[in-house]
């Protein structure tokens, strides 16, 4: 059975794992760094250290290849990890670009501060002369999702501020360039006053992998137990899974 490692700064990558599990039966080992979330705004040195901590932990399970289910890590440490471990690492950013290929016109990229400041999506998507990209750092959404305090009023206020430019310019395509954001996709859609293409790269990722296994085995490791991990994991993963919290910090 193929062993696939999937990792993220916290709960967001579970939206990727969920889509993978729907169509690709394999043995999954997911690591969510709920202890050190959010990753947006961290230095590259910190992100390298965090990613090494995670991959070193997952290597104990003889992983065949990895999915970096975090845009922030994808734009900062992908090449570093490939060189260090000599293994296949699939960054969510590459799949996001492929998911955007069938669209053109105006794009709003919602991501963390690190992802937006890298201008990864703007530089790549605007290679198409028919495309214009607007970028908004929506980092506060990650905090609210991970806190899971059900403060819908504050959440709606932040969503409104982040999508204001989309409503003003009637942007046709909104890329969820952080794997946390699909958790509140329905809320984002409701705050828009028009129909837009909401692009979730995780859906495209699941269509891009193949698995010959007949069995699905999901193992989830979180670096810290929080109210959000207790409440959201059962809602995000509707397949049988084994949940483990690390007894010691990384």
List where the protein language model places each region.
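Non-catalytic structural scaffold of enzyme domains
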Residues: 1-250
